[in-house]
Amino acid sequence: MRVLGIETSCDETGIAVYDDKLGLLSHALYSQVKLHADYGGVVPELASRDHVRKIVPLIRQALKNANTDIADIDGIAYTKGPGLIGALLVGACVGRSLAFAWNKPAIGVHHMEGHLLAPMLEEDAPEFPFVALLVSGGHSMLVKVDGIGLYAVLGESVDDAAGEAFDKTAKLMGLDYPGGPRLAKLAAKGEPAGYQFPRPMTDRPGLDFSFSGLKTFTANTIAAEPDDEQTRANIARAFEEAVVDTLAIKCRRALKQTGYNRLVIAGGVSANTRLRETLAEMMTSIGGRVYYPRGEFCTDNGAMIAFAGLQRLKAGQQEDLAVKGQPRWPLDTLPPLA
């Protein structure tokens, strides 16, 4: 089976062609980072309009690079949610329209299920069951995964997600958009010594996350310290260490609670080098393994949507002709494969 995947949940237009026998045949990605940089964040209306401009040329490019024509496509998968409703509807409209015109089945994919399954695109893919840490600009959650669609959310962010905290803290430090990667780059030059940043919600039972207080603590520290490059780097490092330690502590608890020894990390923040190092060390110390997608598939992309959609289309799941987008969509409401 060969599936065309379409991702337009936020500020990246991602298109891919995935074959269940040959693997990933092509993927094309357009990022709107430059478009939104002047505003310090994603402007939903601008994002939607840019998806409209880019999506059809990218589909043509992906099909050409995959040496695939319409007759070779067996189904279409598009991101249905969660995300920005205008951006979601662009992908949903195009995906449903192509499915109708080409007489192909189509399915709306959960964006976070795409991230969760992204490590399956790698040669050394994890086997079920495992615990997944999904960390991005909009989500931070720990999920017990027993199979595709067999999800139990163990904990999630009650306010700011980890990626959102990175971006907002970077803005406080005067760093350009997108802030998360720039803060991590600055942190690599710093030393956390001398700062005692809190590890939020680790002093109590449970697996939920909260990063808004840590952001406020960082803002107060910035205001109280000298405004020089090394001090800013040290504060960035202390902030990063606090976030990473918090995520690691919660992951260890989730693994102990489930009895699993495989950990998947996915989402934009999973590209963070310090997070990867810390979780790799932790899993080695407890005799487990950690899995994550390659860097280009940590952020939003069409490949993960094509892969996730293919699994459900193969199981006979598809949707009607209605164009739907779901800005909010709990992951654990998804049905299992038939």
Swiss-Prot record:
SUPFAM superfamilies: Actin-like ATPase domain (SSF53067)
Binding site for Fe cation: 111, 115, 300
GO MF terms, alphabetically ordered: iron ion binding; N(6)-L-threonylcarbamoyladenine synthase activity
InterPro entries, alphabetized: ATPase_NBD, Gcp-like_dom, KAE1/TsaD, Peptidase_M22_CS, TsaD
Record: residues binding substrate: 134-138, 167, 180, 272
GO cellular component, as recorded: cytoplasm
Keyword ATP-binding recorded: no
GO BP term (any one): tRNA threonylcarbamoyladenosine modification
Cofactor(s) required, per the database record: Fe(2+)
E.C. numbers: 2.3.1.234
Catalytic activity: L-threonylcarbamoyladenylate + adenosine(37) in tRNA = N(6)-L-threonylcarbamoyladenosine(37) in tRNA + AMP + H(+)
Keywords linked to the UniProt accession: Acyltransferase, Cytoplasm, Iron, Metal-binding, Transferase, tRNA processing
Cofactor binding description: Binds 1 Fe(2+) ion per subunit.
The organism's place on the tree of life at top rank: Bacteria
Location of this chain's protein in the cell: Cytoplasm
Family: Belongs to the KAE1 / TsaD family.
Role, per record: Required for the formation of a threonylcarbamoyl group on adenosine at position 37 (t(6)A37) in tRNAs that read codons beginning with adenine. Is involved in the transfer of the threonylcarbamoyl moiety of threonylcarbamoyl-AMP (TC-AMP) to the N6 group of A37, together with TsaE and TsaB. TsaD likely plays a direct catalytic role in this reaction.
NCBIfam families named in the record: gcp_kae1, T6A_TsaD_YgjD
UniProt name for this protein: tRNA N6-adenosine threonylcarbamoyltransferase
